[in-house]
UniProtKB/Swiss-Prot annotation:
Its main location: cytoplasm. This is tRNA N6-adenosine threonylcarbamoyltransferase. GO terms for cellular component: cytoplasm. It comes from the Bacteria. Gene3D superfamilies: 3.30.420.40. Its EC number is 2.3.1.234. InterPro entries: ATPase_NBD, Gcp-like_dom, KAE1/TsaD, Peptidase_M22_CS, TsaD. SUPFAM superfamilies: Actin-like ATPase domain (SSF53067). Belongs to the KAE1 / TsaD family. Its cofactor is Fe(2+). It comes from Polaromonas naphthalenivorans (strain CJ2).
Length: 356
């Protein structure tokens, strides 16, 4: 069975094709991605209206590229999957509308996919996929969560941020230091030349006794320190960047280790854009190696939003028998969910026609 996946939740347009006849997980046949970073950079962040319009321009040409690369036609596709949420409402509607229109024209079923489930299952796109069960650290621009994953569709929330996500802490701190959008990668690069112990920054909720996160206070501390430095900020920017990164990473690592200890699981999956951070990977790898825990990451190209993870999540749900294809056929109305907690999703079938 061929599954076409479309991602349009924020500022990347992604399309991919997977084959679910492969075992034990679907095989990625082709994928294409277009990033809107350059378009949003002058504004210092994502402009939702511009994002939606650009998705409209890109999604069909990318689909054509994917089908050509995979040496298939749209008529060969069995299921069309799209990101139903969470994300920007207008951007989500573009992907959902295109997916359901194509499905209706081809007489094929369309299914909505949870964006975070896509991130969670993205390591299955690698040559060394994880095995269930595992603890997952989901760290992106908008989400920071620790979850226990027993199988596809079975997710237990262990802890999450109560305010800013880790990715927001990176991006907002970078912006306070005068770095361009998106700030996180710029901050990480600058931190390579700095001293992570130069500034004493808070580690919010580090000793809270639970697995929740908080990064809003850290952002405030960075702002205070930047103002205190004044004209010296430019010469001390690398140190402040390194200290900020060290604070974020320490909290992520220690909370993750606590989750592994609490669940007694020996496998860890790290997914989402922040999962590409070199310091985070280095510290997690070292700590987990000492404890006999295997760590799995997506390939770097699949850390940020992409169509491959959406196609993979849909394909794995189909393989697990969690999707009622008969209920999808012949009805192409749809809705999107800009706010949608993965723990609410659980083993709910991803039906394009389901009500919110």
């Amino acid at each position: 069975m061929l599954v076409l996946g479309i991602e349009s939740s924020c500022d990347e347009t992604g399309v991919a094709l997977v084959d679910t006849s492969a075992s034990p997980t679907p095989c990625l046949l082709a994928h294409a991605l277009y990033s809107q970073i350059a378009m949003h950079q002058p504004y210092g962040g994502v402009v939702p209206e511009l994002a939606s319009r650009d998705h409209i321009r890109r999604v069909l040409p990318l689909t054509q590229d994917v089908m050509k690369s995979a040496q298939h036609t749209l008529a060969d596709v069995d299921v069309i999957a799209y990101t139903r949420g969470p994300g920007l409402a207008g951007a989500l509607l573009v992907g959902a509308g295109v997916a359901c229109s194509l499905a209706a024209a081809l007489g094929k079923p369309a299914m909505g996919v949870h964006h975070l489930e896509g991130h969670l299952l993205s390591p299955f796109l690698s040559a060394d996929p994880p095995e269930f069960p595992f603890v997952a650290l989901l760290v992106s621009g908008g989400h920071t969560q620790l979850m226990r994953v027993d199988r596809v569709g079975s997710y237990e929330l262990l802890g999450e941020t109560i305010d800013d996500a880790a990715g927001e802490a990176f991006d907002k701190s970078a912006k306070l230091m005068g770095m361009p959008y998106p700030g996180g990668p710029h901050l990480a690069r600058l931190a390579l030349g700095g001293d992570g112990a130069a500034f004493k920054l808070p580690r919010p909720l580090l000793h809270s006794g639970n697995l929740d996160f908080s990064f809003a206070g850290l952002k405030t501390a960075v702002l205070t320190q930047a103002k205190k430095l004044g004209t010296e900020l430019e010469s001390r920017k690398a140190d402040l960047a390194a200290s900020t990164q060290a604070a974020i990473v320490e909290v992520l690592v220690k909370k993750t280790l606590a989750a592994l200890s609490q669940t007694a699981l020996k496998r860890l999956v790290v997914a989402g854009g922040v999962g590409a951070n070199a310091l985070l990977r280095s510290q997690l790898n070292a700590a987990c190696q000492q404890r006999g825990i295997r760590v799995h990451y997506p390939e770097l190209e699949f850390c940020t939003d992409n169509g491959a993870m959406i196609a993979m999540a849909a394909g794995m749900r189909l393989q697990a028998g969690l999707v009622n294809l008969d209920a999808l056929r012949g009805s192409y109305t749809f809705d999107v969910k800009p706010r949608w907690n993965l723990s609410e999703f659980q083993s709910e079938p991803a039906l394009a026609t389901q009500n919110a």
